[in-house]
């Protein structure tokens, strides 16, 4: 990336879009993802005039800085996973109580059973965490946070952009005419 000057070109795009005076439409198509630096470059909040509008497919588009699995690796480490297991898994909670109350060889056996249960349940809790994180990357959540203007099925996109483009161009034309007067 450094050799190809990707970051330098991305910053030029951000500079250009932040001062752009015409409407820009960004659409995430079905099964499309907008991640990482691309998300930052095309974020609708970088233009103070509100000229950038982001839309997405309502069913399968994803967007965000990190992928769900990467977010889980950062935010849901082993200690938090154990705390969640303790809160949600009654068997794990009982084994943890047994391990803390026991002493000597009984404590070693109780800890072994606790670790065994943790290893058994860890994949399930990891999968739930990834699904939860992925739910925050879907169109519904992006709409709720204001990152998207509209989420629509793929069949409606052509009609939507035709009419939205016409309206935005007229709005901009009238705005420039009023400012020039």
Question: Where are the regions a protein language model picked out?
Answer:
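Ligand-binding clefts of soluble mixed alpha/beta catalytic domains
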Residues: 1-181
